[in-house]
Amino acid sequence: MNIIFDGNWHFHKTFSIWSMYYQKKNATPEENEQLLCEALRDKEKQQVLLRKLLIDFCAAINRFKNVNKVAIVIDSSSWRYRFHDDYKYALTRVRGAYYKDFINMLNIFENYMRKKGFIVSRVMGAEGDDLLYIWSIYFTQVLEEDLVIVTGDSDIRQIINPQISLFCNNSKNLKFFCIPERVVEWTEYFDTDVMIEGVNSFEIMLYKVIMGDTSDNIPKLKKGFGDAAFRKFIQFITPYTKPENVSVIEMAQWIADRFCKFTKSTNYEEILGQVLFNLNMTWLNLSVYNEYNFQYENGKSLLMNMLDNVNENKGSYNYTKPSFTLEDIYGAIIK
């Protein structure tokens, strides 16, 4: 078994808890931002955050047996901004005064994990989602081994298959997502505090394309089309054969055809265009990366850069428990 961490999720989750200790209830937002700036620049407080990151990291890994490799992926500026200027605008238009210090601390965490020998994957133009997908292909199709992705990003559920599962180690709820056929197996594998849920990964993708996502600035295909309507749509198209090895346009046509029939829409071209846009923004599939073959500074496409990153890092670490001793964790020194 191999494990991939969504590094941004892991960092944000831990940071949100750590940051509460350095804010005051009666302070203004501006005052609390300044307090966070000071905390992120303080060497001792940086060490507290780094130790917490390592402890949470180990706690997640130690729930699994016979782990071979552990990788961590971290975001860079997304290629999707070239596609849509306002991509994730709602999330990025306001950045706290501590933003640069936050990124600096993320870089410190990244460098520390690299020094410890873990695979740390970061590619210009690629979001963590993109790298999670590319690494999942390597672990499951090249090595033909099981993979668990540790993340709180529900979008990643669209790549779940018989060999890929998802573990959400939220501080409030521990959830594990897998194909329905492996629910019993994983239920017996875990302690009782982990909730196991079987999901249909293809329908996860359909939901995002049809229902949209305001956090990613992805519009809904039809106003007033709610969850109840989506469930009826799934019933309407069932039974269906999931399209395999198709282009972005072919997948968009498959969805648009059925959506227009279900809604009795006559605006097929408009619906098709919107489905195509939504697919390009959300679908984790090689077809997307091939179709939009953006060139980067080194003259290579994003896909080639991601594949090169896998080839460069795939052999860098063989995981043997425990990854860190207590001395490693509490001796983590930020210079």
Predicted regions and their residues:
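Extended two-metal-dependent nuclease catalytic cores across DNA- and RNA-processing enzymes
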Residues: V67, R93-A332
